[in-house]
């Protein structure tokens, strides 16, 4: 006679949770490691960007001239794709990155307040001006398509883990930033909706 078969389902495999999202999927290599914040262009002439869809947080803030710039924050430094187009820092972006103990990636910076912030707060940064870790290059396809030079710089995200080791950058999160970056509700006990219906939403800047 044949052996009886078990009808029980296998136990699900739980991956580590991403501290920036509270969602499972963080690689084992990234547990307890620092996130990475990358400066990205956000003007019409530089669109479309690429690599930002993999970011866990996108920070958009005004810079001079009424335009905005993005800072993409990736919780898993081993899974960052190539990102384009990379732009320069303004002083408030590295301060936001610092609040997550993130490694800060940029290509250039304004030399007044930003330089003071870098020095005063000992920001861990990787800069395209010096092509730190050979992590920066120009997108030849964009150049061929007629994009302006400043809109063609990209960051070689897949090469970052090896470059961080080569550059001697700290990769472990400091003690103040261990665990989840936010207070997340347990997925098995979602919060009940409260409040009143919103008929109109208006956002100004």
Which residues does each predicted region cover?
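Gram-positive cell-envelope targeting signals
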Residues: 1-7
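A surface/extracellular/periplasmic glyco- and lipid-processing/surface-interacting theme
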Residues: 9-57, 64-205
């Amino acid at each position: 006679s044949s052996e009886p078969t078990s009808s029980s389902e296998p136990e699900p495999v739980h991956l580590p949770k991403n501290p920036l999202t509270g969602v499972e999927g963080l690689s084992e290599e990234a547990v307890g490691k620092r996130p990475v914040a990358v400066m990205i262009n956000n003007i019409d002439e530089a669109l479309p960007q690429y690599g930002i869809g993999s970011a866990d947080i996108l920070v958009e803030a005004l810079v001079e001239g009424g335009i905005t710039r993005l800072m993409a924050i990736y919780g898993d430094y081993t899974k960052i794709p190539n990102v384009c187009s990379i732009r320069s820092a303004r002083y408030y972006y590295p301060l936001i990155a610092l609040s997550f103990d993130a490694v800060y990636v940029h290509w250039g910076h304004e030399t007044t307040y930003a330089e003071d912030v870098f020095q005063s707060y000992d920001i861990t940064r990787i800069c395209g001006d010096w092509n730190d870790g050979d992590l920066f290059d120009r997108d030849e396809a964009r150049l061929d398509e007629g994009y302006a030079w400043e809109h063609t710089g990209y960051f070689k995200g897949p090469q970052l883990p090896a470059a961080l080791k080569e550059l001697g950058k700290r990769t472990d999160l400091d003690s103040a930033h261990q665990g989840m970056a936010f207070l997340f509700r347990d997925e098995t006990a979602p919060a009940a909706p409260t409040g009143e219906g919103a008929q109109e939403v208006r956002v100004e800047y």
